[in-house]
């Protein structure tokens, strides 16, 4: 499952980070509005799926049975986020996309993240799981870098560069899983 997460991360963020890097190194963000908007749209969906996969990793790792409410919450929030991402009011390809829709679509995403942070924190602690002891922190860091971008990137464009350490936090997430899997197979 961490392989799926790596592909989701790489493909989703490539659509967002590559145009941003090219824009900042060439003619500026204003000349890459469509590419940046499309990249944000794609990465919004892929990262939602990333969290659903991460939830299933938690269930598998800790042999979770039941927890129907948590499963329903994760899937409902993911579905709501994807529906909100598809709404034309997002104006993804426009230079003046409304901040309000950036906030609306990120509320279910943040709630998904919060649920998964709590689940991994509690489970790693209860199971004395040294391999996954920092999984919760990778998610906290990813949101700590992501939230300022959502709220301030239109006013302070360079803040969009926080997407790079956000991606590094996600890479750390995948590495934690890969190293644990490699260790358990050996």
Per-segment meaning from a language model:
Residues 76-103, 120-124:
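Membrane-helix boundary elements
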Residues 52-58, 83-88, 107-133, 145-152, ...:
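Alpha-helical transmembrane segments in multipass membrane proteins, preferentially the mid-helix core
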Residues 71-74, 95-113, 129-136, 163:
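A loop-to-helix transmembrane entry motif
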Residues 136-182:
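Terminal transmembrane helical module of multi-pass membrane proteins
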Residues 28-40, 94-107, 156-168:
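Non-cytosolic membrane-interface motifs at loop->transmembrane helix junctions
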Residues 15-32, 37-71, 83-85, 120, ...:
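Internal transmembrane alpha-helix with an interfacial aromatic "cap," most often the third helix
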Residues 4-22, 79-81, 137-150:
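Hydrophobic alpha-helical transmembrane segments of multi-pass membrane proteins
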Residues 1-2, 58-70, 95-98, 122-134, ...:
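Membrane-interface helix-boundary motifs at transmembrane edges
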